[in-house]
């Protein structure tokens, strides 16, 4: 018990607290200095950054300037002011929705939720179906089939998304085939937001299904044979045996897969980068990456605020499942 608590404090509690503290600060304002630049045609004065003074400020206060919770409510995050102004100035709901979807945080929120709510159930169902199918195969072909099935999970997300990105390109095998089928040389899966979202969701299902398959396949080996044999004697067909014997036995496993898949899908990032879909699809992880990819000015405060809001959203999404699981655990004791 003690080692577990120590590990949770070191690897979970302390990092979250440090991120929260960082979210309360923003970068120092760069001090300026007047510089005189001379050339053969004369001298002129320009305004530049006082590098030495800026370095001294960062050394004195490495966290930056204290900003409190203002970062959480600025335009790049919860944007309460912009939402209020958009609601007040909009005559129709469609006008307000345009304002809503133009805000970075809510744009990322909608895509992240859509991606998670579509990919998670499809992954569970597809993984379960694949596990049932492979479990009935003969031993000679079962091994190679399992290896081929888990290949999408072996491939790193970034490489897998890049390969699919090249395949759906207009000159790729999938992109050119779709153009031939619809007789439209200008049709592209990367041309619209909806098609981009569908492509990303399809890739997510393809990449994460092997994980669900492996867990379900391992759990199928633990299904007791006595209830199945009794069901066969009673005349139950295959579907009835799966419905009344297998599924109840695998329900806790399905809950486990749902929890892991939801947490994994919420932090979707590599497919967006691999598909170059930043203009059409943004996630919380991409917002954090966007804040930190500028080497000269890294917005640590903004990235930390997005991280805390992501943690809160994960907690909200997982709370119903955790409560239900806890109640069932208490009833079974």
Predicted segments with their positions:
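A structural signal for multi-pass alpha-helical bundles of membrane permease subunits
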Residues: 1-333
């Amino acid at each position: 018990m003690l080692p577990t608590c120590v590990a949770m404090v070191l690897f979970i509690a302390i990092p979250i607290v440090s991120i929260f503290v960082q979210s309360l600060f923003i970068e120092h304002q760069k001090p300026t200095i007047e510089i005189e630049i001379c050339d053969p045609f004369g001298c002129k004065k320009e305004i530049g950054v006082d590098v030495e003074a800026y370095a001294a400020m960062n050394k004195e206060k490495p966290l930056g300037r204290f900003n409190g919770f203002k970062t959480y409510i600025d335009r790049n995050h919860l944007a309460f002011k912009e939402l209020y102004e958009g609601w007040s100035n909009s005559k129709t709901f469609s006008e307000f929705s345009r304002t809503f979807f133009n805000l970075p945080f809510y744009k990322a929120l909608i895509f992240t939720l859509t991606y998670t709510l579509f990919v998670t159930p499809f992954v569970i169902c597809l993984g379960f179906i694949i596990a049932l199918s492979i479990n009935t195969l003969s031993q000679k072909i079962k091994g190679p089939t399992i290896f081929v099935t888990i290949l999408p999970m072996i491939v790193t997300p970034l490489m897998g998304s890049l390969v699919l990105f090249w395949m759906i390109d207009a000159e790729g095998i999938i992109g050119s085939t779709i153009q031939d089928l619809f007789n439209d040389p200008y049709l592209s899966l990367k041309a619209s937001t909806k098609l981009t979202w569908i492509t990303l969701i399809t890739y997510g299902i393809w990449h994460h299904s092997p994980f669900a398959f492996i867990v379900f396949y391992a759990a199928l080996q633990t299904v007791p044979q006595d209830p199945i044999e009794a069901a066969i004697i009673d005349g139950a067909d295959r579907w009835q045996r799966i419905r009344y014997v297998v599924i109840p036995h695998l329900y806790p496993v399905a809950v486990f897969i749902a929890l892991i898949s939801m947490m994994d899908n919420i932090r979707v990032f590599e497919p967006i980068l691999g598909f170059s879909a930043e203009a059409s699809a943004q996630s919380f992880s991409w917002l954090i990456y966007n804040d930190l990819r500028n080497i000269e000015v890294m917005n640590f405060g903004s990235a930390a605020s997005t991280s805390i809001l992501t943690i809160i959203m994960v907690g909200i999404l997982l709370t119903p499942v955790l409560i239900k699981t806890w109640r069932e655990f208490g009833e079974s004791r």
